[in-house]
Amino acid sequence: MEPKIRRILNKELQRQRDCICLIASENYVSRDILEVTGSILTNKYAEGYPTRRFYEGCEVVDESESLAINTCKELFGAKWANVQPHSGSSANYAVYLALLKPGDAILGLDLNCGGHLTHGNKFNFSGKQYQPYSYTINPETEMLDYDEVLRVAREVKPKLIICGFSNYSRTVDFERFSAIAKEVGAYLLADIAHIAGLVAAGLHPNPLPYTDVVTSTTHKTLRGPRGGLIMSNNEAIIRKLDSGVFPGCQGGPLQHVIAAKYVCFKEALQPKYKQYIQNVKTNAASMASWFKQQGYRVISNGTDTHLFSLDVGKGKDVSQWLQQANIVLNMNTVPFDKNPAINPSGIRIGTPAMTTRGFKEKHFLYVAALIDKIIKSDGNKKVIKEVKKAVLKLLERFPLYKGLEY
């Protein structure tokens, strides 16, 4: 291997081994997924869909893509699936291309309240090519206000309503969203990038019976390779959705990643995966409860999912202090945050990655105490050094990718 990139790979491997990862959108894939993602399939160009390609020599990748499609449908109970999107953003873009015209109104959750860039943010394609409107959350409960969603939808008459979030910790009522969309004549898109694993495990309501289309990533709670997917039970729009991906916004799909997605879906069908997701939820709820007992403002007063947010006043400083102690998470805005996104008030904490690594409830509570110690020290260098030492000692008991070296 080229020496410079070998050094970087081993350096990153060591960083992952030596850090407690609490980034809600990250996880550790299996060795099988690592291997398939780096496989010979990366060599094959395969524009089009199985049995309908624009290149010859696709008979083998037709098999792997068909496996991925069918296993995805089995996992989520979908009538149709497209596994070609390179990311969640690509999946959303393809849906917009398929169902909307430039300038059409879209309605999504405000970014500061937990929405995503691709749900209508003015700096994103979704806010530039379409007319974006937003709903917020109840400022008291910090939960979705379905009455407000209905009020705004009646007012702006969107062509598409998006229910899906990057930082919302409560169960989503897809049935209520469906009723709102039907009343105003809008398509309903559920972006389940964060909660896909919970849905797959049956530990969060499935949006497919209530929505026109569902998008997701494969690399968060699903614990797969980096990528996206689209699903639908609305047979009237599936040809449009296929065209939205190819030729709409992508050319050749990444066949090595698609094969790894199949492995991911297959792993998520195993009984032990449901127990994993249950542990993820339990660990997040326990951590959130502990912080609440210590007097922290936990957004929405808790969590039903794999993540939660804390208002710590200075999220950027806190996230940087924690990184110095080998605890990695991300700064995040809190609802109605008066601070800018580059220096927000909050931090976001997720439990999928370290649950994969073997952490139990007691380990997460120990880490919560370490986080609390650093915050209360106001980033004291001596305290950070002590916490880093404790982190490294704890991680000795949880080896990551044992025997792997580049």
UniProtKB/Swiss-Prot annotation:
Its cofactor is pyridoxal 5'-phosphate. SUPFAM superfamilies: PLP-dependent transferases. The record marks H219 as: Plays an important role in substrate specificity. It is found in: Cytoplasm. Keywords: Amino-acid biosynthesis, Cytoplasm, One-carbon metabolism, Pyridoxal phosphate, Transferase. It catalyses: (6R)-5,10-methylene-5,6,7,8-tetrahydrofolate + glycine + H2O = (6S)-5,6,7,8-tetrahydrofolate + L-serine. GO terms for cellular component: cytosol. Its EC number is 2.1.2.1. The modification N6-(pyridoxal phosphate)lysine is found at K220. (6S)-5,6,7,8-tetrahydrofolate binds at L111, G115, H116, L117. Catalyzes the reversible interconversion of serine and glycine with tetrahydrofolate (THF) serving as the one-carbon carrier. This reaction serves as the major source of one-carbon groups required for the biosynthesis of purines, thymidylate, methionine, and other important biomolecules. Also exhibits THF-independent aldolase activity toward beta-hydroxyamino acids, producing glycine and aldehydes, via a retro-aldol mechanism. Belongs to the SHMT family. Homodimer. This is Serine hydroxymethyltransferase.
